[in-house]
Amino acid sequence: MSQIPDLECRAISKNFDDFKAVKEVSFSVPQGTFFSILGPSGCGKTTLLRMIAGFQKPTSGDLLIKGNSVLEVPPNKRPVSMVFQHLALFPMMNIGANVGFGLRQRGVNKTDIKQQVERVLERVGLGGVADRPVASLSGGQKQRVAIARCMVLEPDVLLLDEPLGALDLKLREHMKIELKQLQSEFNTTFVYITHDQSEALVMSDQIAVMNHGVFEQLGTAKELYYEPSTAFVAGFVGEANRFAATVESVNGTDVQMITDQGKALRGVDAGQGVQRGDTVDVFVRPEAVRLSRDAAQTGQLGNGGAGKVENILFNGANSQLILRDQASGAQMNIAMPQTGEFRDLTQGDVVAYGWEPQQTRVYSSARGQHGL
């Protein structure tokens, strides 16, 4: 892998009058990496992508591709290609003409265009379809044609702006796997923009979680999921039960708290140096919570109690149980075990639950930013 990153942003900022859309963002993407920028609507991720593509000029900072600044390079001269959410295929052209459009604009001769188009269509699994109309393709095939149209130009970086957003759920799940396989096949750096955490977690080598114009955390999918560095990342990446609490005592990283609803909890300081008396936000994943018909089994875990079943959200392997803690009234979302042991639970049943302190992450509070 090359020591010079394919893409590097150095303190990139973008202001729209008094509004700061992107605030001094710095990162680098090594060659051949699937890099995702994940965040909610309005966080600045599309603005950042448009600056990389050259459609918008940064207010400050520098942007380098293969070690060379491209701030003064127009979009059509940058070694990047872009796949949009709605693909922008030309309906009046056949598939081959769509894929070869960029090569024609570059003045490549017809023989070479035909060879390169056939080669790239083979690589995306669409060999022999060059003469077919675009309208004859399925949604997934159109997606591959859009990627082929970009990859035939051999860009250093491929930018993808929520390209799966217009697809139905089943096809979207399939295309997540296909996109990752295509990226590996071409060994090209992908920079992928999405608000869908599942897309980012499944496909990416590295993920940057963006919020209010800054990167909250940059890391692997596992790091973001199991070791979120901020309360925003803990709440945005994956599902979590969230509580507001006050710290009772701290011993190293071990934190004992009382929630606003009066429930005692033990957890782990997420590296923010919380102290006695601090207000904190507490997170625990639904799959970290264990169920039992015997309170003695969960009573030794460190956190938990007895809860009344309020609802059962059946979703196959992703089914969840909604409990109301009998002591505090707090709501708990708990992933249903796949053993089938608790599938007979019904609304109104009481069941014991618990989880270990190591599964509880504690962050300095930003009260007013959550609904609990």
Question: Residues of each region from the PLM?
Answer:
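Helix-to-loop junction immediately C-terminal to a conserved catalytic motif
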Residues: 53
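Conserved ABC transporter NBD signature motif
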Residues: 61-69
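Non-catalytic connector elements of ABC transporters
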Residues: 240, 250-372
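ABC ATPase nucleotide-binding domains
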Residues: 75-81, 85, 89-235
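ABC ATPase nucleotide-binding domain helices that frame the ATP-binding cleft
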Residues: 46-49, 145
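The feature captures the beta-strand-to-loop junction immediately N-terminal to the Walker
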Residues: 38-40
